[in-house]
């Protein structure tokens, strides 16, 4: 195939081009991310304005640094938007620990990524429920909380969640640490009835801090 040629040092993938391999609806919005195959923004680089399900298809073996210029993104440990999630908001990430440094787990791989299309910091709401299927005690949240327990949530687990608007990142531990779960109003219809729907890496219903995603 003609696309097998080595890409130039800087290539731009507009939404129309990436749509060939993107299983998600092509977003139409102000998203832009530049990824590098070496730390500190060195080596091969590529610019994207839409989702990339497999960076290896672009000639990379891994992403080792990146710059988010527009919008919010979520990166994944594995191809196909699987594995641990890493929220990527506007700014520079010179090496892997810049996006997973608050994570309790040593993960240096970032193999796929996509825009967080519903991020809206000012108009975000989420309701957390004590049990699966939106049962039990509930609490509507519209602000950032580094510790749910300190604000009165009874335990360190959340059974299910509803997101009518915006996008959130939930963390396993207080202080925005541990596994990250990016939850959005435009995924699952905003209804996450069980912790297994939070991501392929979810192994527990433990959630102890939560914040709105910055667009």
Curated annotation (Swiss-Prot):
One GO process term, biological-process aspect: visual perception
Domain Beta/gamma crystallin 'Greek key': 31-70, 71-117, 124-165, 166-214
GO MF, one example: structural constituent of eye lens
InterPro entries xrefs: Beta/Gamma-Crystallin, Beta/gamma_crystallin, G_crystallin-like
PROSITE patterns reported in the protein's UniProt record: CRYSTALLIN_BETA_GAMMA
Keyword line: Eye lens protein, Repeat
Residue span of region Connecting peptide: 118-123
Superkingdom, taxonomy of origin: Eukaryota
Alphabetical list of Pfam families matching this protein: Crystall
Residue ranges of the region described as N-terminal arm: 1-30
Protein task: Crystallins are the dominant structural components of the vertebrate eye lens.
Assembly with partners or alone: Homo/heterodimer, or complexes of higher-order. The structure of beta-crystallin oligomers seems to be stabilized through interactions between the N-terminal arms.
Annotated family: Belongs to the beta/gamma-crystallin family.
Domains (record comment): Has a two-domain beta-structure, folded into four very similar Greek key motifs.
Protein name (database record): Beta-crystallin A3
Name of the coding gene: CRYBA1
